[in-house]
Amino acid sequence: MLRRLLERPCTLALLVGSQLAVMMYLSLGGFRSLSALFGRDPGPTFDYSHPHDVYSNLSHLPGAPGAAGAPLAQVLPDCPERSPFLVGPVSVSFSPVPSLAEIVERNPRVESGGRYRPAGCEPRSRTAIIVPHRAREHHLRLLLYHLHPFLQRQQLAYGIYVIHQAGNGTFNRAKLLNVGVREALRDEEWDCLFLHDVDLLPENDHNLYVCDPRGPRHVAVAMNKFGYSLPYPQYFGGVSALTPDQYLKMNGFPNEYWGWGGEDDDIATRVRLAGMKISRPPTSVGHYKMVKHRGDKGNEENPHRFDLLVRTQNSWTQDGMNSLTYRLLARELGPLYTNITADIGTDPRGPRAPSGPRYPPGSSQAFRQEMLQRRPPARPGPLPTANHTAPHGSH
């Protein structure tokens, strides 16, 4: 029966036509659609072997020295959704480390406090870049040199905040980010909060520093440290973006993670428990290079992280922005960034070994999966709003 069908001319013509149609579909981008259905969309193709200089096209921006000035009209048009000044992959070099004076000279339109606003059009996003920091001056200069032109080409209104932890106690990245969010929101009603590690430099300016109104974005999806792929599906470290409402809906970040490790997985769990989902740019776009460095004194591996992660689903509504206390020591408007120096206290547990369950080396990924699959508790009551004030005697 099948043989007789295949011998008919009309059947053969139908099979050949179907094959040609499939080939045509794939050649016109259908493969990308199938990838989106059955896996992560790899996104557009970029040639990272021939990157552009990170300062490319900066002189072409309206209002730049030598460029056409901004129109005199009182009402400016909206900036395009995708800036015409983008170049794609940009070169990232770790040496020589530029001086602050050199960075200022190359970014003449950046204003006091690290603020920038495009000329000639109304920006579609006001983005605050918040960088936790301590004893990484070379890394900070590399980031500032790289990030300012990167963001200007995207035609965003932005400000860079560097949150400096005072003292020599154990580093607390997540708590510093909470401090940065609160201080940034006191300055302006930002549309988007970009939480940015100091040692990560973006490699593609099509990776737009804007938020997704549908949910938190994890932006550093392809780091050279991990072979330009995600280390595990729920990873939320490096660079992330949230609207102020999203940040407050999940009660910000935890304050109790002193030292290296654990807070990223706590944050990913908070996103889910708050009823939100993580989105990401295509892998081909979210490329980052990490500045090489040795382990930091005061940022040793956190021995308590697994015990804290066990409690996340019960503690996230009590530990975060609504429990944040710190002492503001300085607020300085530098030419390239706003410096916030804060005393955030010290680890109340000290360096002693944790109590409770212990987990063998190599079990962290299985542990993450277990934590992220637990059912959320009942929805909490209202969390603090962006204009929430700190307890008396603290910020």
Curated annotation (Swiss-Prot):
Sequence intervals crossing the membrane: 11-31
Cystine bridges: 79-121, 192-211
Lumenal side: 32-395
Compartment(s): Golgi apparatus, Golgi stack membrane
One GO term of the biological process aspect: protein glycosylation
Matching InterPro entries: Galactosyl_T, Galactosyl_T_C, Galactosyl_T_N, Nucleotide-diphossugar_trans
Names of required cofactors: Mn(2+)
Region of interest called Disordered, as start-end residue ranges on this chain: 341-395
Main function: Responsible for the synthesis of complex-type N-linked oligosaccharides in many glycoproteins as well as the carbohydrate moieties of glycolipids.
PANTHER family membership: BETA-1,4-GALACTOSYLTRANSFERASE (PTHR19300), BETA-1,4-GALACTOSYLTRANSFERASE 3 (PTHR19300:SF33)
EC numbers on record: 2.4.1.-, 2.4.1.38, 2.4.1.90, 2.4.1.275
Cytoplasmic topology ranges: 1-10
Binding site residues for N-acetyl-D-glucosamine: 262-265, 305
Membrane topology: Single-pass type II membrane protein
Pathway linked to the protein: Protein modification; protein glycosylation
A cellular component annotation (GO) from this entry: cytosol
Protein's recorded name: Beta-1,4-galactosyltransferase 3
Xref: CDD domains: b4GalT (cd00899)
